[in-house]
Amino acid sequence: MTTAQTTELDVQPSPLALLLLGREADPRSERGVECPGDLPSPSDPDLVERARAAKEKLGDKVFVLGHHYQRDEVIQFADVTGDSFKLARDAAARPEAEYIVFCGVHFMAESADILTSDDQKVVLPDLAAGCSMADMATAEQVAECWDVLTEAGIAEQVVPVSYMNSSADIKAFTGRHGGTICTSSNAKKALEWAFEQGEKVLFLPDQHLGRNTAVRDMGLSLEDCVLYNPHKPNGGLTSEQLRDAKMILWRGHCSVHGRFSLESVEDVRARIPGVNVLVHPECRHEVVAAADYVGSTEYIIKALEAAPAGSKWAIGTELNLVRRLANRFAPEGKEIVFLDKTVCFCSTMNRIDLPHLVWALESLAAGKLVNRIEVDPETEKYAKLALERMLALP
């Protein structure tokens, strides 16, 4: 479990005012606090200077992490940028930083807290910045799934592999049951390792990354994969289906990458002759199969860096990153467009805006610890074990 605190540095935590995150009515999906004090107005013309001044006052005591999907107004203040795992490791490599301000979403801040020292404090500028995919697998649901696998007589054959985009509770479950974490960059290595440990894999929470890696990279068939729906009795599967499957995929997905369709690919090819279609592996299987290139955010960036001048690219990932890359490479004559005609930001990632960042930095500069993300020791122990197994992958 994770706690979120907003406190004076020298006093006890004040009561938390909960915010409902997303559309779920389940109270377990509630997370976040209202910002105590005055949140700066988005129209404040001094926001940039206020952020710069607060960061300068904090000096080496603060280390700001910016995920690739963040707004430009926020990313300009990041000391480093990257995907979730890279940023968590970067934070752990800066032990002199007392405060880690994570401009990302909740599960990322949890991972940073797990990998950093006890003396470091991880802050999320807006605690309502969650991840719909991470919230699609709760600890209770996954425990129930394991009971279903046990009743089917296959639990001992199953190795859990959890995507980095999961809660600390799910990472801890994975660690307790002998599994590992994976990223979109090393999912193949994680699956290869898992199949050396057991006959089957429970992959969660992103069905698409699991399916794409198993079929595209591992040579499994679609028939080797079954979809476990936590909202149906026994996951909507028979014991025979579970026993026959090699990949048990959790019914979760990324709300952004799940929007891209085969029609999106066909349309962009018709509009832009010679375009290269490059998508993230969180996209649907048919989209990945129709793309020219598939890879993580880091892969996408490197592919565009290496692309020749005059090349044309349609990118299937979050719009903030695509826009930033289009602007960056336009002077080199590289045409970069968003794969879908419908604008699609990550709404929860976009909750981290400049006013929230200014509020967090100014609060820390004034001696007030706000929005701290803290994973409890028991959860941290097993989540870290799962992360360490990933770090040990060849």
Predicted regions and their residues:
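Active-site loop-to-helix "anion-binding N-cap" substructures in soluble metabolic enzymes
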Residues: 2-316, 320-394
